[in-house]
From Swiss-Prot:
Record text on subunit structure and interactions: Component of the eukaryotic translation initiation factor 3 (eIF-3) complex.
InterPro entries: eIF3h, eIF3h_C, JAMM/MPN+_dom, JAMM_MPN+_peptidase_M67A, MPN
Alphabetical UniProt keywords: Cytoplasm, Initiation factor, Protein biosynthesis
Protein name as it appears in the record: Eukaryotic translation initiation factor 3 subunit H
Functional description taken from the UniProt entry: Component of the eukaryotic translation initiation factor 3 (eIF-3) complex, which is involved in protein synthesis of a specialized repertoire of mRNAs and, together with other initiation factors, stimulates binding of mRNA and methionyl-tRNAi to the 40S ribosome. The eIF-3 complex specifically targets and initiates translation of a subset of mRNAs involved in cell proliferation.
UniProt xrefs under CDD domains: MPN_eIF3h
Pfam families named in the record: eIF3h_C, JAB
Gene3D superfamilies from the UniProt entry: Cytidine Deaminase, domain 2 (3.40.140.10)
Protein's organism: Neosartorya fischeri (strain ATCC 1020 / DSM 3700 / CBS 544.65 / FGSC A1164 / JCM 1740 / NRRL 181 / WB 181) (Aspergillus fischerianus)
Length: 347
């Protein structure tokens, strides 16, 4: 509840905080949390390429390390589980796959404990009626590649690292505390109303009090074909991510063309130098060095493929969300297929 309240209050800006608990028999039990204070990073600071939103970089900020240790010490004094088991962040429309989340989780798994997790609470999706709370860890293969900063095409082909291997999602189960469970059992149940007589006709059923008061009554509004605004926004974000993917692809293709041009120039220079050395050898003159091209030519540096991997993972995230939301609209479209397409009958 603390996590959901904090994320909802700061929405749509990013909210981050620390989670504490215990590791019991291989199960990570989260029992408490507290938010991180937002540290204003000065403009001249270059700490980890600090993001425009200071809250997104708060979990790995040096100023919050002391704050986190002090909070855990005070929790321990009041006999609360005070083992740091990870951190949490808010998300909007599932857009949590970014460099800030990667760097924060890498910091926790490297500096604190490899079993720490990142809890992601999607405020927008939770507002649709179902709680969205997911837990992630960075995979060991991605941790190794990120530590060595090896995200070139050659290294990715050698290691077989794909965008699906960035995160390892863990199952999440939510339980009430024993005090809340005991309180719920003590609540009085409402009195069961006496059974009512069945309506004699359809007209009596439609005009009766049951239709006006119950949400289970037949309602033609449920057949409306209006598109959910949440689904529409997800489609827009998916298109933006696809455009970003095309931009990254064009940048990499530009690098490949530049590399091919430089390699052709180097090959032509080496061929010319070999001919010159052959002529000088025939004249018994000293040969010229053939490795001088390394000083004369500079090969373009291959751009990192990390951003492309993260964007591909974000596209996959949006696609999964859209797939989970189109089921209701698709069912309605098939229900009225016979009326939309004249000449066809439903089979």
């Amino acid at each position: 509840m603390k996590i959901m309240k904090h994320c909802s209050q700061t929405f749509p800006t990013t909210a981050t905080g620390s989670i504490v608990g215990m590791d019991v028999g291989g199960t990570l039990e989260i029992t408490n949390s507290f938010p991180f204070p937002v540290v204003e990073v000065p403009p001249e600071s270059h700490f980890d390429n600090a993001a425009a939103n200071p809250a997104a970089a708060a979990p790995r900020a040096k100023a919050n390390t002391v704050y986190q240790a002090e909070m855990i010490r005070m929790l321990r004094e009041v006999n609360v589980d005070a083992n740091n088991v990870g951190w949490y962040t808010s998300a909007n429309m599932g857009n949590f796959v970014n460099m800030n989340v990667i760097e924060n989780q890498f910091f926790y798994q490297k500096e604190m404990n490899e079993r720490t997790v990142a809890l992601v609470h999607d405020v927008s999706r939770s507002s649709q009626g179902s709680l969205s709370l997911r837990a992630f860890r960075l995979s060991p293969r991605f941790m190794t590649a990120f530590k060595e900063n090896k995200f070139t095409s050659e290294e990715l082909q050698k290691s077989g690292l794909r965008y699906q291997d960035i995160f390892v999602e863990l199952p999440v189960e939510i339980h009430n505390s024993h005090l809340i469970t005991s309180f719920i059992h003590q609540l009085q149940t409402p009195n069961i109303p006496a059974p009512t007589d069945l309506p004699p006709s359809l007209a009596a059923l439609e005009s009766g009090p049951f239709v006006k008061s119950s949400i289970l009554a037949p309602n033609y509004d449920n057949l409306t074909l209006s598109i959910d605004p949440f689904l529409e926004k997800n489609c827009d974000l998916l298109l933006d991510s696809i455009e970003t993917h095309h931009t990254e692809t064009n940048n990499f293709q530009y690098y490949q063309r530049s590399l091919a041009r430089e390699q052709q120039r180097i090959s032509a220079w080496q061929q010319k130098r070999k001919q010159e050395n052959a002529t000088r050898a025939a004249l018994k003159q000293p040969l010229l060095p053939e490795d001088e091209w390394q000083r004369l030519f500079k090969l373009p540096q291959e751009p990192s493929r990390l951003e492309s991997m993260l964007n591909s993972r974000q596209v996959d995230q949006y696609a999964r969300q859209i797939d989970s939301f189109v089921s209701s609209t698709t069912g309605k479209m098939f229900a009225v297929k016979g009326n939309l397409l004249p000449g066809e009958t439903a089979k």
